[in-house]
Amino acid sequence: MDATFWAFIALVIFVAIVVYMKVPGMIGRTLDERADRIKKELEEARTLREEAQQLLAEYHRKRKEAEKEAGDIVASAEREAKALLEEAKRATEEYVARRNKLAEQKIATAETDAINAVRASAVDLAVAAAGSILAEKVDAKAAGNLFNDALAQVKSHLN
């Protein structure tokens, strides 16, 4: 019996003790538990990844909606500003037109007043000239006849 035989016997006894103590089952259970734990962690990681992708897609969608809404707001503001500008321009043009018309009316009134004043002055001058000419050339009897004729003409024009 040499040392190899005793080493073989020791190995057989060791294997028998290991089998008797159910070490292979414990190793199997430990490996199974570890595999289950790894499987659960992988499933949890997959679930978290899917949730993250859903959140990312939702944030992209919300960002696009916000960009679209901002674009709509800017377009609406531009339309309103353009409308306000056109309204202000129209109101200014109307104001200028009213002021021009009023100024033209004042000018026309001033022209009419000036023409009437010139005519009145001309009439006064003509009456004064006619009066002085008549005073020099007409005697009292002819003046009375002229006065009566003029009075008759005025009466006929008034009736």
Swiss-Prot record:
The chain crosses the membrane at residues 1-21. GO terms for cellular component: plasma membrane; proton-transporting ATP synthase complex. InterPro entries: ATP_synth_b/b'su_bac/chlpt, ATP_synthase_B_chain. Keywords: ATP synthesis, Cell inner membrane, Cell membrane, CF(0), Hydrogen ion transport, Ion transport, Membrane, Transmembrane, Transmembrane helix, Transport. Its main location: membrane. GO terms for molecular function: proton-transporting ATP synthase activity, rotational mechanism; proton-transporting ATPase activity, rotational mechanism. The keyword DNA-binding does not apply. It is found in: Cell inner membrane. It comes from the Bacteria. It is a single-pass membrane protein. F(1)F(0) ATP synthase produces ATP from ADP in the presence of a proton or sodium gradient. F-type ATPases consist of two structural domains, F(1) containing the extramembraneous catalytic core and F(0) containing the membrane proton channel, linked together by a central stalk and a peripheral stalk. During catalysis, ATP synthesis in the catalytic domain of F(1) is coupled via a rotary mechanism of the central stalk subunits to proton translocation. Belongs to the ATPase B chain family. PANTHER family: ATP SYNTHASE SUBUNIT B (PTHR33445:SF1), ATP SYNTHASE SUBUNIT B', CHLOROPLASTIC (PTHR33445). F-type ATPases have 2 components, F(1) - the catalytic core - and F(0) - the membrane proton channel. F(1) has five subunits: alpha(3), beta(3), gamma(1), delta(1), epsilon(1). F(0) has three main subunits: a(1), b(2) and c(10-14). The alpha and beta chains form an alternating ring which encloses part of the gamma chain. F(1) is attached to F(0) by a central stalk formed by the gamma and epsilon chains, while a peripheral stalk is formed by the delta and b chains. This is ATP synthase subunit b 2. It comes from Brucella suis (strain ATCC 23445 / NCTC 10510). The lineage of its organism: Bacteria, Pseudomonadati, Pseudomonadota, Alphaproteobacteria, Hyphomicrobiales. The gene is atpF2.
